[in-house]
Amino acid sequence: MRRRQLLALSVLAPFALVACEGPEPEASSGGSGSAAPNFTYSPKGYDGVTIELDRPVERIAADFYSAAGLAQYGIKPVAVFGFGQNESPGKSFDSTGVEVVGTDMELDIEALAVTEPDILVAYGNEKGDGWTWWDEKVKGQVAELVDFVPVKLSDQTPDDMFAQYAAIARALGKDTESGDIADERKAFEDARKRVREVAAKKSGLTVLLANFSAEMNYTSKTLGIAEMLREDGLDLVGPDSSDDSSWAEVSWEKMSDYPADVLLVHDASVDYEDNPVFKRLPAVEAGQLGTWDDKRAYTYDGYAKWLNELAEVLEGAKQIVEK
């Protein structure tokens, strides 16, 4: 059993050391259910990886997105780090009262050690032995402090991600089937049903998922969120991505080659609104626009809200592109 020590460790380049101050929160079980007498978890997608502790888990560190995914089960971490802190409300984790030990690719190892987490839950790398953006040095430093619990991100649909966080919550002794989470899950399922129903009624409607920027644009038909929309009956258009990426690059000169009845603009898109090519896209001229974001935290309420917004766009859309 690993015991955390307050080591004077620091993360050097390529990570910047950040100072984290403030009150140290206690991990909160919240909700119904009690902490499991010990912790055993075998994460999906990581064959042969099992995390075992011979004691209950009381203190959890997590990346912002995993903190959000677990918060819906009444789990509050003692420390958070990583990407997502500055996302809009409902898309990430509200870190009020929680120690922030790093943002983006920064991590303060010493500050993490002070919070004494029992486990650290975050998007896992290929082996599942560290955060997907850590280098070997940082991964080793963290491994000296705390057991890492990976969440597989690549090739996962939203349903897959929800299932992973539910499995971690169950391993922590949480009730994942009743109470508020059951209501939130039903709202998500109802929103997906609404999308499926409008997709069935408007089977000829085409949809393009795009992330715009001043120099280059990116589209996807194979990201997990895109797979969910395809499962629900949407006809996604756009270029095929390469074998090693879920994204396809599309220059502004080529954007008109992929017309769509409905255009979903990624929330991270920048410097595109005044581009004359954008203004001439059929969906833009028709005002048939919506949003999407593959970086949205995997919470049922957040996804339900977005899916209902999407359904409203689809319900008001017409087929404007000739086949």
What are these regions (language model features)?
Residues 86-88, 126-137, 150-169, 204-227, ...:
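Extracytoplasmic ligand-binding site segments that recognize negatively charged/polar headgroups
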Residues 59-73, 175-235:
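Basic- and aromatic-lined ligand-binding clefts that recognize polyanionic substrates
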